[in-house]
Amino acid sequence: MKMKKLFVALMAVAMLLASECTSNAGIRKSVNKSRINALVEELRQEARAEGIKSERESLTLPGIKLVSENNLDVVSIGSLGISFIKLGAKKSIEDAEDLRTARALFKGIKKLMIVSYDECSQELRERFNRKVARTLNGCELILEAKDEGEAVSIYGTTSRDGSRISDIVMFAPDDGALICFFGTIDAARLGELAASAGKIEGSVKDI
C-alpha cells in the first residue's frame, strides 16, 4: 500500500479546507460507516472463499485488531485502541509539538480502519471497488488526485465553516487501499498529520 501517497493527499485536503470558507456538506449524504464495515467483512469472506492461501498472522489487543490472511490485510482500531496509540505516541515521539499534534488529532477519532487488498485477485479487487464506489456515490468528495495514472479519492463531511471534518474515507482503488477515520477531526490538524505520519505510525508499533 502506498501510504506516503495517501498521506500527501490528506495534507492537500488540509490546504483545500483552509482556503474554503463554505461547504457543500448540507447537500451531500453522510458516509455510511455501517455499510463500509459490512463491505470489508464481505471482502474477508470472499477472500477466504477464493481459497488463496497465505500465511495467517494476527494480533489482538484491547481495542486493536490486526489480521493478515488470504492476501488481505485489515487493521481495525477502536476507541480503546486509540487510547493505546496515544500512550505509544507519548513514548515514541520526542518533540513536544509533534506529540501534542498526534494526541489532538486522535482526540475526536472513534475508529481507524486500514484495508490493504492489492494482492487479492483482480476479480475480487474490482468487485470490492465497485461496491465501495457505489456506497460513496453522493457523499462529499473533498479531493480527488491522480499520480502516474493512479487515483486517490477522499470523502468526508465538512462543517459549514470548514473547521471540522467527519468520517474521512481515503479510497485508492488502483492501489487496493481503503483507509477510514471515523469520528471528527480539526481540519487545521490534517496537514500536521501528513507531516507526522511516520512518527505516528511508529507509535503503533511501540504499543
Where are these regions (language model features)?
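Boundary at the C-terminal end of the N-terminal hydrophobic targeting segment
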Residues: 18-19, 23-25, 49
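C-terminal partner/receptor-binding element of secreted or periplasmic proteins
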Residues: 184-207
